Regions:
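Short, Lys/Arg-rich, polar N-terminal cytosolic tail immediately upstream
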Residues: 1-9
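Hydrophobic alpha-helical transmembrane segments of multi-pass inner membrane proteins, especially
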Residues: 21, 25, 37, 43-343, ...
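TM-adjacent membrane-interface loops and short helices in multi-pass inner/ER membrane proteins
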Residues: 331-385, 393-398
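Transmembrane helix boundary and interhelical junction motifs in multipass membrane proteins
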Residues: 167-172, 364-369, 380-382, 448, ...
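Pore-lining and gate-forming transmembrane alpha-helices of multi-pass membrane transport proteins
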Residues: 387, 398, 430-431, 459, ...
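Transmembrane alpha-helices of multi-pass inner-membrane enzymes
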Residues: 231-234, 449-486, 490
Length: 490
């Protein structure tokens, strides 16, 4: 194998760099809009280090320096140091739990003099490197249980440590890594299980306070979830178990049993028919375990565990809600429509909607947003900065920014796909694309009321050095890896 030197100036993807610089520039201008005050600040004050805009400008300058340094590091060092970097950040995340001060109920910030750093933002690139290194290792296979266990552990360990820091929003970002695994050949069954879990949670928690009119003792959420579990189980038996007849028996048996229980409760003796549904789910799992013993077909065992796990997950949903911070509980309950609190936790979302709606088609103009200038929207320069864009630039401006993000993410995916046999860079590229997509969807979703407010920043726009540096590091490493895509040839 011959190796040729890389001409970074010619090999680097300049289009991606231009898109990055455009996003960072628009982000800084949005922070100017969100923090500018007609009565107190002048245009020159925006450049002062005493203001958020001046500080953000300093973070941007430091980000450029970090990018230049990382672009000078050869690919072989990223591959060689992937695991050490990952384990180092795992240690830092663990230490942060104990040494970080309590800031708004979270122990996720390390304070060094006047500077506050959030390790969770930097652990994303460490996890991306480790995942890319593992999946590109010779002999790695999605069919090996040990490899799957290692793969899941790399994602779950930092995620759990961040949860222990009471930073649930940042921890949820790590779920985006499973999209990368799906691209690399992971079976779609895990994604299907994830979708089922979301449905169980939304329906179970969202309808937990409602009861059937004809049977007041039957909880609507519990009834629907216990109806879905055997149906999803039957669907999996038909798809993965390759036994359509067994799938029809499972679905038909559960529906018939539930219907008979409803008739008995409605016209004979009233009782909670969810008890019968629970028994039917247990019988379904036992039947699948019996078929596994009889035929030694592993899919039956896994589907039986899915059925039992679904029941356990449903009952654990309320326990999970109880473990969250009170303000996080209220945000989820408001999002699911269980409670209405327009002057409390729902205040941010309501004011954000008002700000975006008041922008109309073309917006009120740069620095002319009244909702933002009068500070109606809390955290308008950080998590809710998108409402500033909506108010001042209108629907057209919001659409332009979203299209810019879409183009940027698609470009990153293109960089990942053009790597050929270079699996390390491809996996890393998809890690970055998945993280960006998750941040974009959740942040914009929570600003317009479609997602819970969980404190996830908008990449390159939200105020703060940790987020900007974290994404700059992620992108800089990808650009260097991509620049070396043709440096090795046989």
């Amino acid at each position: 194998m011959a190796i040729r030197n890389v001409n970074l100036w010619q090999s680097i993807d300049w289009l991606t760099i231009i898109l990055y610089l455009v996003l960072v520039t628009f982000g800084w201008l949005s922070i100017c809009s969100a923090t500018y005050d007609f009565g107190e600040l002048t245009e020159l004050d925006l450049l002062s280090f005493d203001t958020n805009t001046g500080k953000q400008l300093a973070w941007i300058g430091c980000a450029m320096i970090i990018a230049l340094i990382l672009l000078g590091v050869e690919k072989k060092y990223y591959e060689m140091l992937a695991y050490p970097i990952y384990f180092a950040f795992v240690v830092v995340l663990a230490v942060t739990i104990f040494v970080a001060p309590d800031i708004k109920g979270s122990h996720s910030w390390l304070v060094v003099g006047p500077i506050r750093i959030q390790p969770a933002e930097f652990s994303k690139f460490a996890t991306s490197l480790a995942l890319a290194r593992l999946l590109s290792t010779y002999g790695f296979s999605m069919a090996k249980r040990t490899d799957i266990a290692k793969m899941i552990a790399i994602v779950i360990v930092p995620m759990l440590l961040i949860v222990l820091q009471n930073e649930t929003g940042s921890a949820l970002v790590y779920l985006s890594f499973f999209l990368v695994l799906y691209r690399e050949g992971m079976t779609g069954s895990l994604l299907a299980v994830g979708v089922c879990a979301v449905l169980y949670f939304v329906i179970g928690v969202g309808q937990s306070g409602n009861f059937l009119e004809s049977m007041p003792m039957v909880c609507v959420g519990e009834f629907i979830v216990f109806l879905l579990i055997p149906l999803f189980t039957a669907l999996m038996v038909g798809i993965y178990g390759k036994r359509l007849s067994h799938a029809l028996w499972i679905a038909g048996g559960n529906l018939t049993g539930t219907f008979l229980a409803w008739l008995f409760s409605r016209y004979v003796v009233p009782f909670d028919i969810c008890i019968v549904q629970l028994i039917l789910c247990a019988c379904t799992a036992l039947y699948l375990l019996y078929m596994y013993i009889l035929e030694r077909y592993a899919s039956y065992l896994l589907i039986a565990l899915f059925a039992l796990g679904s029941v356990g997950f449903y009952y654990s949903c309320n326990m999970i809600i109880d473990k969250l911070q009170p303000h996080q509980q209220m945000r989820i309950l408001v999002l699911l429509g269980i409670k209405d609190d327009p002057s409390g936790v729902g205040y941010n979302i309501n004011q954000s909607k008002i700000a975006i709606g008041s922008g109309g088609l073309w917006g009120k103009g740069f620095l002319n947003g009244t909702q933002t200038k009068l500070n109606y929207v809390p955290e308008q320069h950080t998590d809710f900065i998108f409402c500033t864009i909506g108010e001042e630039q209108g629907f057209v401006g919001c659409t332009f920014i979203l299209l810019l993000y879409a183009f940027f993410i698609i470009r990153i995916i293109m960089l990942a796909e053009r790597q050929g046999s270079n699996k390390f860079t491809r996996v890393y590229g998809y890690c970055l694309a998945s993280i960006l997509t998750f941040h974009l969807f959740v942040n914009v979703g929570m600003v317009i009321g479609l997602a819970p407010v969980i404190g996830i920043p908008l990449p390159f726009f939200s105020y703060g050095g940790s987020s900007l540096w974290g994404f700059t590091i992620l992108l800089s490493i990808l650009l260097r890896l991509d620049a070396e895509r043709d440096s090795h040839y046989r």
